[in-house]
Each structure stands twice: as C-alpha cells, then as structure tokens.
Amino acid sequence: MRYYEIVFMVHPDLSEQISSIINRYTTIVTNAQGKVHRIENWGRRQLAYPVNKLCKAYYVLLNIEVSQDTVKELNDDFHFNKNIIRSMIVRTKYAIVEPSPMMKKIEENQEHHATNI
C-alpha cells in the first residue's frame, strides 16, 4: 500500500451533493482495504482561470493509503465523472493527517468572523 494525496474540484452547482461525492470516493478506498487519513472540504472557491466555462468550484482534499489498482480506479472514475472538473493525484512518502495550510487559513477566517460578531 502506498500513500497518496488527492485534490479534486467538483462542479459548483452540486452544493447539496458534496458530502455524497466525498463518501463515494472514501467508500471506494475502504472497500479496497485502504485507509483514509484526512478529508478536507475547502468549500466553493474562485478559480484562477475558467475551466469548462466555470469560474468557481468546490475543492476537496483526501489523503489515503491504497494499492496502485485502487488509485487507477479512482483516477478513471474522476475522468469519467462529468461532475468532477479537475483532479490531481500525488504520491506521498507518509500519511499526512495534520490540517493543510488551506484548511488552517479557513479555520482562522471562521474564528476571526466569530469573534467579530
């Protein structure tokens, strides 16, 4: 089993289905005897440039431990799923479980807004 970091962008009109999409991919990992070490939903964010005529997308980060066959299955699913705008799979040397810099920034913004109310 190897460690991977996956970032994928979901169509912005699917706000109610984000959790089911995340659940779908985590289920694929766990059914293949893999482990999910980290799940982060970064929310709806502005894209740096239009992708498929869209200017916003929901970003999701997964850190997983799976076999190469499962990664190929996930990659194929990302490519054939019309709701996934873009995806990137990167192999890592170890399991990453701490919050990403993006998630830390989101949490700081939420705390800042909570204290200003």
From Swiss-Prot:
Keywords: Ribonucleoprotein, Ribosomal protein, RNA-binding, rRNA-binding. GO terms for molecular function: small ribosomal subunit rRNA binding; structural constituent of ribosome. InterPro entries: Ribosomal_bS6, Ribosomal_bS6_sf, Ribosomal_S6_plastid/chlpt, Transl_elong_EF1B/ribsomal_bS6. It comes from the Bacteria. This is Small ribosomal subunit protein bS6. Binds together with bS18 to 16S ribosomal RNA. It comes from Blochmanniella pennsylvanica (strain BPEN). HAMAP family: Ribosomal_bS6. Belongs to the bacterial ribosomal protein bS6 family. GO terms for biological process: translation. NCBIfam families: S6. The keyword Plastid does not apply. GO terms for cellular component: cytosolic small ribosomal subunit. Transmembrane segments: none annotated.
